[in-house]
């Protein structure tokens, strides 16, 4: 399973982003998981990213890191895909 952290860089404080990177690194180092961190660039980008990754057919776990908008966008990207699960890391 691939773990994908979709991070809104405008949500929360800068130290919040570092904590997310630390969590991702712990998954990679301690548990040997494949991890990817992606910063969103604009409104709608999280939906686009999640949808494109889901279309690969890989087993994915998404971490929506931001506020309500980020969560909504990631959810819209993964809806309808059986190969994806999503959780929320509130930062907004």
Feature roles, as predicted:
Residues 1-62:
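ATP/NTP phosphate-donor binding region
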Residues 2, 80-81:
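Short, conserved loop/helix-junction motifs that constitute active-site signature segments
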Residues 9, 65-67, 89-91:
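Glycine-rich beta-strand-to-loop/alpha-helix junction loops that act as flexible
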Residues 17-19, 75-78:
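Short amphipathic alpha-helical segments
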Residues 46, 69-74:
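Short glycine/serine/threonine-rich phosphate/pyrophosphate-binding segments
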Residues 62-63, 85:
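Nuclease catalytic cores that cleave nucleic-acid phosphodiester bonds
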Residues 64-69, 78:
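N-terminal glycine-rich "phosphate-gripper" loop used for MgATP/nucleotide binding
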Residues 81-92:
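Short, acidic/small-residue loops that bind anionic groups at enzyme active sites
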């Amino acid at each position: 399973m691939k773990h994908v952290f979709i991070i809104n860089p405008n949500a929360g404080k800068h130290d919040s982003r570092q904590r997310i990177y630390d969590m991702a690194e712990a998954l990679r180092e301690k548990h040997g998981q494949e991890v990817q961190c992606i910063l969103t660039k604009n409104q709608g980008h999280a939906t686009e990213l999640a949808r494109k990754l889901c279309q690969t057919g890989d087993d994915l776990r998404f971490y929506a890191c931001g506020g309500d908008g980020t969560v909504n966008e990631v959810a819209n990207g993964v809806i309808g895909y059986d190969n994806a699960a999503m959780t929320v890391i509130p930062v907004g």
